[in-house]
Amino acid sequence: MEDKNIKDDEILDDQNDNQEDVQNQDEEKEIKPKKPKKKVYISDDENAEEIKKRIESLKNKNNNISFRVKPPIFFFLILILMSTLFYFYGNKTALFQEKREISYTQFVTKVKQGDITEIRESQEKLTGIKKVAGKVEVFETNKLTDRLGQDTYLMEISKEKNVNIVVLGTPVSSIITRAIFSFAPLFMLLFFFYFINKKMMGSSGGVIGNPFNIGKGKGKISERPNVKFSDVAGLTEEKEELKEIVEFLKNPARFEKAGARVPKGVLLLGEPGTGKTLLAKAVAGESEAAFFPISGSEFIELYVGVGASRVRELFKDAKKEAPAIIFIDEIDAVGRRRGQNKNGGGGNEEREQTLNQLLVEMDGFDTDQRIIVMAATNRSDVLDPALLRGGRFDRRIEVSRPDVKGRIEILKVHSRNKKLASDVKLEDIAKITPGFVGADLENLLNEAAILAARKNSDEITMEDLDEAVDKVGMGLGQKSKIISKRDKDMLAYHEGGHALAATLIPGANKVHKVTIIPRGDAGGYMMPLPEETLGKTRKQILAEINVLFAGRAGEELMMDDIATGAYSDIKRATELAKLLISSVGMSELGPINYEHSDNGFMLSSDLSNETAREIDLEVRKLLKFKYEETLNLLRDNKETLEKIATLLKEKETVTGSEIRALVSGSSVNEVLELDDEQLEKYY
């Protein structure tokens, strides 16, 4: 009885072990440490009922266990299991018979000796079977020929020895294997596309990844923009024009009473960074309208008809959210003039279909729907005329570069969250940044803040701003770059020549700063302080040519040699000379414009060979005369040029006030001793 109890307990422990192994396969079950086996001696009379209950409990737990296997893993496990079963089914003799791999020569010898009574031919092997006294021996070798019937020698021996020959069919395992390997690439490809599709749907909200939504618009309903007109500085006239759009979206009845029709479309024209997108957001923010931003290139896709479908979807969504503003950035990507590509092409046809749909949609909504289409581009010359006619983009607003006043306002807006030192004068920064747009000025202040942070300062100083202007305008300074004495002298005379000519020649721009510190691609540079005018006069253009030539003239005069550093100066001087002669008619050839005409397809010249030769001669004559004139000017002021070069080699960076002090007669030492207040009178 005691042995029986021990045996029952061991069975119970084994069941516990099996149960624990099953539980370990369940990912969601807590893994418990395996307890050591213990032999418990109990009496059969007292504990028989308890043992039955424990066994029943274990059975119930086994029934409740569920195997949670991920579908892809489960699929592959089933596939492997089926392949294994088919393999063993097709080769069942391999499970129960011992095989001996022998050579072909040994195989033939055994047939001769009568050791093989049956030969079985498969696809790649010959299997010889010998049955003696109920025992079976199996010999296997590789086939010498594709088919056994082609092996005449072995066939003759087999016939003599009365060997039974059996040709086996293709094993089931081979069929399954072939099927698996045939269809596996297809299934893998389908699984790959399914996986990529799920990923794209997850990352794009189902719009891009779902092939049934391929035509849905990519424009997203933005939260009501919190940008106001007060956040847009330097664009006074542009904001005044757009205030009418805001009033229409907020109070359309006012315009309807007067019988006025508000423009359906507003086209913002301007160079990159001038604030076109910011203006569109400000209109939406002021009018509290839904904002649908989209790029023109997002309409064009690989599939034909997708662009037109997205246009329809975009306008459909906008009508649901009215009042709404649809903003198409870089509209020239989809709104180019039709018919220019004479070679055809699917991409061009798709773009034209998209443009046609856009034109139809802009005609299809009424003004009472309170939907405004705004677009931005810097290539208005390539837009299709149908876009610009009345009833579509019939209001065009030029967003120009800001003037000095506008730049001051922009700097004030972008410096709201920055701490400026007491010496900072934003007016001075605005004066030395002509041509900078809002994006450039924002970047300038950000660079200045980074420079201040490098010095562990929480204030931006005027020095930081001045360095940021150079970095944004010319590139990173290379103060650690080693320059030979000869190169330093050449740079000093080159930049000194520019500065001297700009100071002496009437009509030239004032000098703001001169430096011989390499920055970007330039070995040094002279920064002018140009006056902002509506246009340039002939005198100003000629003075600029003189200043450009002064660098090369300074090298030739003081070093008796010239360098390649004047390449960009000569190129710019040649462009100005051609502008003067062939474009604006300010030469002896008369007020005639000789520019090439653009017929929309290719550039073609209307000039005769004789006229082109006259223009070339006139350009050469003008440039040669201006260079000689500049060389004579520097020769007459050689001592002043030497002083400027000496000061540049001493300080590396010289202000315009110091240059003007040297030209007025001060020595280098006197200028070095001047303080800021004393230099102020030379500003």
Curated annotation (Swiss-Prot):
EC number, as in UniProt: 3.4.24.-
Topology in the lipid bilayer: Multi-pass membrane protein
Protein keywords: ATP-binding, Cell inner membrane, Cell membrane, Hydrolase, Membrane, Metal-binding, Metalloprotease, Nucleotide-binding, Protease, Transmembrane, Transmembrane helix, Zinc
Gene Ontology terms: cellular component: plasma membrane
Localization of this protein: Cell inner membrane
Membrane topology (Periplasmic): 92-174
Residues that bind ATP: 270-277
Superkingdom per UniProt: Bacteria
Record field: transmembrane: 71-91, 175-195
One matching Pfam family: Peptidase_M41
Cofactor comment: Binds 1 zinc ion per subunit.
Disulphides: none
Composition bias type Acidic residues, residue spans: 10-28
Amino-acid positions noted as binding Zn(2+) in the UniProt annotation, renumbered to this chain: 494, 498, 569
NCBIfam families per the UniProt record, alphabetical: FtsH_fam
Function summary: Acts as a processive, ATP-dependent zinc metallopeptidase for both cytoplasmic and membrane proteins. Plays a role in the quality control of integral membrane proteins.
Family, per entry: In the central section; belongs to the AAA ATPase family.
Protein name (record): ATP-dependent zinc metalloprotease FtsH
